[in-house]
């Protein structure tokens, strides 16, 4: 599809059929039927914690020892084992070698835990065997370690079990956040006065990311670019909307499922497979097709944006949680809440401004990045912690890093700076938690929210309860550690409109 300077979604979609209407229960039923004798659990390696924002009531791990997987595989909600487990790897903040090592460790430990569970089941007289599927969850704007991460997962599975991956299904779409794929091209939807318009993702600020920049919006060409030609664009299987919607709006979803499975029949040796997605029904049609392909014997891995898992397991869209639901089962404290803003993308800066403008009772504490990187950083952080703790006694605190992003031409150096800043934020959060626990914690930005969860709040196991806004921004309930009982809000840097951060804060605050 040619890329034009100005595109309208309605015009682009006019070339394709209408969506196939598919209830979530249809997908859940297909999954249940195939898992009757051998339950399948998706292990989602989430390169930052914002991948959970589209799902609800699933276990989340920030550590991945075999014992952690054993807890997750056995955790039951309403008496049933869950269909997916999220593992917060935080690999988007790591260099390639570190990211590969972490992916391998997670996969090996997950497979070991599944073997232990299968052995225990057989010993108890049951015949069921846990099957694992693996999902590499990454950014809906195409940033992250691709193809390194799916390559590593596939190689580890082959080394441990001998199973060879036939195809890697690439689905970055996130319609709730305005990211859609049409005709094999990935777009961002316009907002406000630009509503209805589409911008190819390579023309956005995200394509200029210091660590993970890219030049192509057409996913087949993106694959060729990122694989340095190992996968040619013309070798990529494209599941466009003609295939995803083959059944038509009133047709049998099985028609679409068969068309999808037929289209990827030739996949072998980790063939890249990209999929068009515009609506939730498209996710469900794709899920049925992938289930059919796997039933036929195809071995697939997934490289996806946040909502893919919801569609793949047939989970209903969870309505946005209220403030009362966020505190359900826990008595909120009278202290202020802590809003931590680390992301530097444009939408986050606008959201921060809107929150500061509207929340006049909040105290603003800034971590100056230049001051942090030079001089007495320890003494500087002592003062920051003191300011935060004192302010929490009577107000919400907005803790943010200075908005001037320090960039270099060296991707590794950019990551090092990002990690130094994140470590400082984590130290402030952790010392605050142990001195004067806040009413709630919101973390804005992927790397920020990951480090705040695992190190600042010392969360090891959590349950994602659902979104705070429709389809975006997830609430985690820590089930252990010093943050147990404190609502933790994971807020991606690149989602929401200018008012979203203020809206979430207003739901949780007692002073806003």
Predicted regions and their residues:
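N-terminal basic/disordered segments at the start of proteins
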Residues: 8-80, 176
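Cap/lid and interdomain-hinge subdomains that line or gate substrate/regulatory clefts
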Residues: 36-41, 46, 72, 81-83, ...
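A structural-propensity feature for long, helix-poor, extended segments
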Residues: 78-91, 392-393, 475-512
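Conserved, well-ordered active-site substructure
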Residues: 58-60, 438-440, 444-496, 500
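Short acidic, glycine/serine/threonine-rich loops at helix termini
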Residues: 54-58, 145-149, 179-190, 284-289, ...
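A glycine- and small/hydrophobic-rich beta-loop-beta segment
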Residues: 325-427
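Short, flexible loop segments at boundaries between secondary-structure elements
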Residues: 304-334, 465-489, 493
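Extended C-terminal subregions enriched in glycine
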Residues: 416-447, 452-454
